[in-house]
């Protein structure tokens, strides 16, 4: 069984319980891990002559045959305007981001350890800018008398 995330855009006039009935009729209640009703929002373009819609996200575990059956039933239901099903097990980048982030931190730490000091960096910049007007990178402390 694979992990899936299903996002539905449904009619704002319809109760969310109707969408839950379709999802629960295809998948058992025990296979549905999480249901999140997002806020009613204004759409970028009208769907079915409406500029507002409800978003509902389901996280569940199921077989691929059940996903095909859900898609068929969602296409029949008039109150489900759009649906999107994502297989979280095979989705590229879903698990990769954590590894890439750890790799990036390790790489940055190596560069920081090898790096030259700030004073040396400022001196090198001043040497290379000798033909131009030298900006002063050093902190100037005003002494008050």
UniProtKB/Swiss-Prot annotation:
Highest taxon in the source lineage: Bacteria
Keyword terms: Ribonucleoprotein, Ribosomal protein, RNA-binding, rRNA-binding
GO molecular function terms listed in the Swiss-Prot or TrEMBL record: rRNA binding; structural constituent of ribosome
Gene3D superfamilies with a match to the protein in the record: 3.30.70.60
Listed SUPFAM superfamilies: Ribosomal protein S6
Signal sequence range: none
InterPro entries xref list: Ribosomal_bS6, Ribosomal_bS6_sf, Ribosomal_S6_plastid/chlpt, Transl_elong_EF1B/ribsomal_bS6
GO biological process: translation
Keyword Plastid: no
Gene Ontology CC, one term: ribonucleoprotein complex
HAMAP family, per the entry: Ribosomal_bS6
Family, similarity comment: Belongs to the bacterial ribosomal protein bS6 family.
Function text: Binds together with bS18 to 16S ribosomal RNA.
NCBIfam families recorded: S6
Protein name: Small ribosomal subunit protein bS6
Origin species: Mycoplasmopsis agalactiae (strain NCTC 10123 / CIP 59.7 / PG2)
The gene coding this protein: rpsF
């Amino acid at each position: 069984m694979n992990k899936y995330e299903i996002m539905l855009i449904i009619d704002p006039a319809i109760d969310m319980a109707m969408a839950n009935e379709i999802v629960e009729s295809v998948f058992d209640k025990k296979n549905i891990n999480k249901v999140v009703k997002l806020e009613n929002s204004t759409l970028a373009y009208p769907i079915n002559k409406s500029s507002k819609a409800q978003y509902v996200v389901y996280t569940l575990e199921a077989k691929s045959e059940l996903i095909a059956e859900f898609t068929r039933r969602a296409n029949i239901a008039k109150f489900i305007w759009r649906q999107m099903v994502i297989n979280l097990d095979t989705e590229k980048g879903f698990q990769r981001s954590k590894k890439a982030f750890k790799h990036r931190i390790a790489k940055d730490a190596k560069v920081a350890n090898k790096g030259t000091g700030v004073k040396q960096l400022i001196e090198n910049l001043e040497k290379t800018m000798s033909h131009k007007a030298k900006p002063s990178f050093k902190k100037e402390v005003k002494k008050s008398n």
